Amino acid sequence: MEKAYRIKKNSDFQAIYRRGKSVANRQFVIYMMPDKGLTHFKLGISVSKKLGNAVTRNRIKRAIRENFKVHKDDMLPRNIIVIARHPAKDMTVLEIQKSLEHVLKVAKLFNKRIK
């Protein structure tokens, strides 16, 4: 995912945590906050060390990024933070995709109807 689509700064994460809205399911928590002037979404991913070793955490992050790449054109321009919860570590990429799509639909972050 290109740099323009990333949230990296701790101050940006903290601002979204404080002022953003959250939606969750068993596997993921989504924090979102609108931002004036954004033409596309920006994504931050947080996977705790409690979920496993670096290999496991990176696999989860890759699956999350891939899901957002697939839906890049379908997303509303928002700042989005995805936090992985413990059940996500045992999921396949397809299960992660379905779970993320579910929580994104609940959060109403798609700009059109996704099957």
UniProtKB/Swiss-Prot annotation:
One of its GO terms (cellular component) is ribonuclease P complex. It is an enzyme of class 3 (hydrolase). Disulfide bonds: none annotated. It catalyses: Endonucleolytic cleavage of RNA, removing 5'-extranucleotides from tRNA precursor. One of its GO terms (molecular function) is ribonuclease P activity. PROSITE patterns: RIBONUCLEASE_P. Its EC number is 3.1.26.5. HAMAP family: RNase_P. RNaseP catalyzes the removal of the 5'-leader sequence from pre-tRNA to produce the mature 5'-terminus. It can also cleave other RNA substrates such as 4.5S RNA. The protein component plays an auxiliary but essential role in vivo by binding to the 5'-leader sequence and broadening the substrate specificity of the ribozyme. This is Ribonuclease P protein component.
